[in-house]
UniProtKB/Swiss-Prot annotation:
One GO term of the biological process aspect: modification-dependent protein catabolic process
A GO term for molecular function: threonine-type endopeptidase activity
Organismal lineage: Bacteria, Bacillati, Actinomycetota, Actinomycetes, Acidothermales
Pathway(s) it belongs to: Protein degradation; proteasomal Pup-dependent pathway
Highest taxon above the source species: Bacteria
Regulation: The formation of the proteasomal ATPase ARC-20S proteasome complex, likely via the docking of the C-termini of ARC into the intersubunit pockets in the alpha-rings, may trigger opening of the gate for substrate entry. Interconversion between the open-gate and close-gate conformations leads to a dynamic regulation of the 20S proteasome proteolysis activity.
Family stated for the protein in its record: Belongs to the peptidase T1A family.
Official protein name in the record: Proteasome subunit alpha
UniProt function note: Component of the proteasome core, a large protease complex with broad specificity involved in protein degradation.
Disulphide bridges, residue numbers: none
Amino acid sequence: MSTPFYVSPEQIMKDRAEFARKGIARGRSNVVLQYADGILFVAENTSKALHKISEVYDRIAFAAVGRYNEFENLRVAGVRLADLTGYTYDRRDVTGRTIANAYAQTLGAIFSGATEKPYEVEIVVAEVGDTPDGDSMYRLTYDGSVAEEHGYVAMGGQAEQITAQLKDRYVENLPLGEALRLAVDVLSRASDGGEPRTLTPDQLEVAALDRTRGRRAFRRFIGAQLQELLRPTS
């Protein structure tokens, strides 16, 4: 009788982590950063039907990279949790931290489980406050780990390159247009070959949580409005 093949738990977790990281690295990058009036989301995305950035609740939004069907399942679950909590208790009880913790539990359970593959996703949950000090951004990885970020966060295959550029160039309280142009510029410079590219409005998905809009803070930028924001000021 042959001896059963043995793989240590440590090796299994290592292999699952490597599998998830490779899947995420194939995705185009996203940038989330704070600006003067809120939180800006910029994704390289040529699809008009499949969103990588979405509203979750009044002042909470979601950005993701990786497998669309997997992060879309998480987005829908987050929206349902937010709606149920707001309806059962109070809208003020729905927070970005609540949504992020729920996602962390789901991702952690899937990553540790033996019956299905880990999710190939990375997520940012952001909530805009009444002031910049009240803003919050939570980054979640494939294994359910959560990190609270400040200022900016990059996800996707070129996240390290983008983060290094933002570390040198980002400043607090940028106007919306300047923040958007910075995000697009660092995305355009992040490539395997190191050569900067030209990203047109048709290749971008852009949205923001704007604290000046009241309860429904989420807004998208498309068409002429996006082109105007991308135009350099003289």
